[in-house]
């Protein structure tokens, strides 16, 4: 029983979300429309958006793979287009 409790506590910590991933999506105030990905904490998925090119925050990734790796998204979760 103690083993199971320890296992679930460790598993929960290992899938914790990076603090940057909890930041809201920020398009920025320029008009470049660069394809990027951000972690949507509501859907618990990385989603595509168009980044303006300036401003923004750390929840802004060049690739889906980078977003999933940094934010701990499991591969069974599919991306959602925005």
Curated annotation (Swiss-Prot):
CDD domains attached to this UniProt entry: Kunitz_actitoxin-like (cd22633)
Chief subcellular location equals secreted
Locate the BPTI/Kunitz inhibitor domain: which residues?
A: 21-71
Q: Does the keyword Secreted apply?
A: yes
**Keywords recorded for this protein, A-Z:** Disulfide bond, Ion channel impairing toxin, Nematocyst, Potassium channel impairing toxin, Protease inhibitor, Secreted, Serine protease inhibitor, Signal, Toxin, Voltage-gated potassium channel impairing toxin
**What GO cellular component term, any one, is given?**
nematocyst
Name this protein carries in UniProt: U-actitoxin-Avd3q
């Amino acid at each position: 029983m103690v083993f199971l409790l320890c296992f679930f506590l460790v598993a929960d910590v290992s899938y914790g979300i990076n603090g940057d991933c909890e930041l809201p999506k920020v398009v920025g105030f320029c008009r470049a429309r660069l394809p990027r990905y951000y972690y949507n904490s509501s859907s618990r998925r990385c989603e595509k958006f168009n980044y303006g090119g300036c401003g923004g925050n750390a929840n802004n990734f060049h690739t889906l793979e980078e977003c999933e790796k940094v934010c701990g998204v499991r591969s069974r979760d599919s991306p959602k287009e925005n």
